[in-house]
Amino acid sequence: MKQYLDLMQKVLTEGTPKNDRTGTGTISIFGHQMRFNLQEGFPLVTTKRCHLRSIIHELLWFLQGDTNIAYLHENNVTIWDEWADENGDLGPVYGKQWRSWPAPDGRHIDQITTVMNQLKNDPDSRRIIVSAWNVGELDKMALAPCHAFFQFYVADGKLSCQLYQRSCDVFLGLPFNIASYALLVHMVAQQCDLQVGDFVWTGGDTHLYSNHLEQTNLQLSREPRPLPKLVIKRKPASIFDYRFEDFEIEGYDPHPGIKAPVAI
């Protein structure tokens, strides 16, 4: 994951101090891209331990169209707790937009089912896109989508994906985002009988919070280790039928975890 460490160093070196919604303060750059060849290993950061259970359960939760944290709590995942209301609701966040985008005529559009059909029936389409950025519902969301828009691309029997992330917490959030979308590419590729290609990450406001700088320097002092391998144990009937037990990571040997506060 040299690309990730290079980005951290770039933000430290070239970033501009900025205020932010949380009041914490950041140093920020605008516009950065990383490319991960998924044939070369699963892009899970090795310079600190990442909580893979949370990454997998969150993605499965998104794919179910769920926007209440009850499922996450049942599986000991707390990453959305700070934004949920007293009933555990988050408003029409990612899962709602992915699976039930409201159309003006009263229909609800299942974007995930749509892209699965496109990949199987029209893989050369340039419109194989999922958006979570629903302008009409942003004010109802507990948190506006950070990873807002992604596009699939098929060439030579390989599935690639590019994500646009409008706001990126480089230290805490980005390792989750990279692994989550890499996992999604593997799942979609398997369902469509494709090989995995590249995951391309594109960031807008790409920042380190001012209270993450010590942790960032510690992480930069560590040598990256070989990437692990993702094993998917079965092929379910649909993209929506995966379970946590279907996934195994082999050869993950990270450095110890590094704690840092979440900016809310």
UniProtKB/Swiss-Prot annotation:
Compartments it resides in: Cytoplasm
Keywords: Cytoplasm, Methyltransferase, Nucleotide biosynthesis, Transferase
Subunit (UniProt): Homodimer.
GO biological process, one term: dTMP biosynthetic process
Pathway membership: Pyrimidine metabolism; dTTP biosynthesis
Catalytic reaction equation(s): dUMP + (6R)-5,10-methylene-5,6,7,8-tetrahydrofolate = 7,8-dihydrofolate + dTMP
EC nos: 2.1.1.45
Binding site for dUMP: R21, R126, R127, R166, S167, C168, D169, N177, H207, L208, Y209
Taxonomic lineage from the root: Bacteria, Pseudomonadati, Pseudomonadota, Gammaproteobacteria, Enterobacterales
GO molecular function, one term: thymidylate synthase activity
A Gene Ontology term for the protein's cellular component: cytosol
EC top class named in words: transferase
Record bears the keyword Transferase: yes
Entry function: Catalyzes the reductive methylation of 2'-deoxyuridine-5'-monophosphate (dUMP) to 2'-deoxythymidine-5'-monophosphate (dTMP) while utilizing 5,10-methylenetetrahydrofolate (mTHF) as the methyl donor and reductant in the reaction, yielding dihydrofolate (DHF) as a by-product. This enzymatic reaction provides an intracellular de novo source of dTMP, an essential precursor for DNA biosynthesis.
Active site: C146
Protein name: Thymidylate synthase
